[in-house]
Amino acid sequence: FSRILSKNGKVIIAVPNHKSWDAKHYKEFWAAWDVPIHLWHFSKDTIEKLFSKHNFKLIKTKPMLFDSFYVALLSEEFKTAKKKFISGFIIGIISNTIGMLTKKGCSSTIYIFEKKN
C-alpha cells in the first residue's frame, strides 16, 4: 500500500476478530472463520504489528456492531442447522456489550492506518 497511497492517504480495512467473545462462544462453529475467504485472522495487536512492519501506524479503530448479529445468526445456523433469530440476536448483544467493555473487541473491527512520518 505504501507505494500507491498518497502522502495523506489512509488504509481502511475491516477484519473479523478471533479474540471476540462470540468467537470463543461458538468455537469451531464461529461463522467468521469463513475459510477460504478469511485465510488469516487478526487481533488488534497482530494487525497493528503487521502494518507497523510496513511503515504504517494505527490511527483509529471502529467496531462493526451490526456484524456481531450477522455472525451470531450464521453461527447459530452452523451449530444447530436451524435459523435461530432470537438466540443470534441475544448473542450479538452479549458479544457487542463485552467487546465494548473489555479489550477483547467486537466480532469485527474496522482499522484505519496512515503512513508513519
Residue map of PLM features:
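S-adenosyl-L-methionine-dependent methyltransferase catalytic module, highlighting the catalytic core
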Residues: 4, 10-114
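Class I S-adenosylmethionine-dependent transferase superfamily signal
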Residues: 1
